[in-house]
Design a protein with these regions (language model features):
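Conserved N-proximal alpha/beta basic substrate-recognition cap immediately N-terminal to
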Residues: 2-104
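Glycine-rich phosphate-binding loop of ATP-grasp-fold ATP-dependent ligases
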Residues: 91-92, 111-137, 162-163, 186-205
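ATP-grasp fold ATP-binding core
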Residues: 92, 105-127, 145-158, 239, ...
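Phosphate-binding site of ATP-dependent enzymes
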Residues: 109, 133-191, 242-255
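A short catalytic or substrate-binding loop motif that flags glycine-/basic-rich loops and adjacent residues
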Residues: 118-119, 155-159, 231-235, 312-314
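A long amphipathic alpha-helix within ATP-dependent nucleotide-binding catalytic cores
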Residues: 147, 189-251, 289-290, 294-305
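ATP-dependent carboxylate/phosphate-activation module, predominantly the ATP-grasp catalytic core
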Residues: 166-223, 232, 259-285
Length: 324
């Protein structure tokens, strides 16, 4: 490969022995393309790199994945999950094609978050707690003009942001793959991941919600995802959730967002599992600007202190694990 910082690469290979070779991005026969997520744009980029059309999804398959990625899928799955549970979870988001009822709801003191139907990772959000009613309505109308509708959901006081990770098959199966625990802004914009084993994440969530409820939600989600992915999508899925502090007690919003693609949570889960020393308090984040001062402390092929640069050094932004 060209253009890779040799000093960074040699240190990664020496410290961690990741068991993989660095290779260029040119297609070789027999390779199975696996982009971060499937879209018309990612398929076109792969085609430009020499990947033959027969190795790529058809245009019809890409259209089905795009429809699956609409936020109304999360609302549908929330309803399917709620129907399987003997305890309450947060209400599903509502798709709105007009703003007629919004002024009365805001006047009554309700607080909402409006979301663009095709958006993710905390982008495309409008929080009524952070703007005037007039601004909220005007921006919501802009969402309708841009994407035909918006999703409206209650704005909660969140005490925990986490995700359940799944592997889905278009044949109609879905397997739980682990947890992700992350930090967000009050409106839900992603900032960083904690790198912890699943058992520790579940223990932290159990401060608010019994493990039995988490397991029931996990099973209900697997059933619901298997249903909506059948004959449409095979690959990783990350279901973002939150635990809200409400007058009714702590409440799980089980489908804040569903990402039918690779996610930062899946990356964090893999990093925690393979490269972080058990018991270390590690965090995975994207750092703007240079991170040339990253200095790792490595024991037995595991990061035990300091910070580790996960990509060749860049002056623009860097993926970093920090401990402490």
């Amino acid at each position: 490969a060209t253009g890779v910082d040799a000093r960074w690469y040699d240190r990664i290979m020496a410290d961690f022995e990741p068991g993989t070779e660095l290779f260029d991005h040119n297609y070789r026969p027999g390779m199975q393309p696996a982009p971060w997520g499937w879209s018309a744009a990612s398929a076109a980029l792969l085609r430009q790199q020499g990947v033959p059309q027969e190795a790529l999804p058809t245009a019809e398959a890409l259209d089905r994945i795009r429809l699956l990625s609409h936020r109304r899928t999360a609302a549908t799955v929330q309803g399917l999950v709620a129907a399987q549970l003997p305890f309450p979870i947060a209400d599903a988001a509502v798709e709105c094609t007009a703003v007629d009822a919004i002024p009365l709801l805001l006047k009554a003191g309700r607080q909402f978050i409006a979301k663009l139907p095709w958006s993710s990772s905390g982008r495309g959000l409008l929080d009524s707690r952070k703007c005037s009613p007039e601004h909220f309505i005007r921006q919501a109308e802009g969402m309708i003009h841009s994407q035909g509708s918006f999703m409206l959901e209650t704005a909660y006081e969140r005490v925990a942001d986490f995700a359940m990770l799944f592997d889905c098959e278009a044949s109609g199966s879905c397997r739980f793959a682990g947890y992700s625990l992350f930090d967000t802004t009050p409106s839900g914009q992603y900032t960083s991941n904690l790198l912890l084993p699943d058992s520790e994440i579940e223990s932290r969530l159990a401060q608010y919600v019994p493990c039995e409820q988490l397991h029931a939600i996990q099973q209900a989600l697997a059933t619901a995802l298997a249903k909506v992915c059948r004959e449409v999508y095979s690959g990783p899925a990350g279901v973002d959730m939150l635990i809200a502090d409400t007058p009714r007690g702590f409440l799980v919003d089980a489908t804040v967002e569903i990402n039918f693609r690779m996610t930062m949570g899946r990356v964090a889960h893999t990093l925690a599992e393979r490269y972080v020393m058990p018991g270390a308090e590690a965090r995975f984040k994207v750092v703007s600007g240079s991170a040339s001062d990253a200095t790792p402390v490595v024991d037995a092929r595991r990061l035990s202190g300091g910070s580790l640069l996960l990509n060749p050094p860049s002056p623009h932004f860097n993926f970093v694990i920090q401990i402490g």
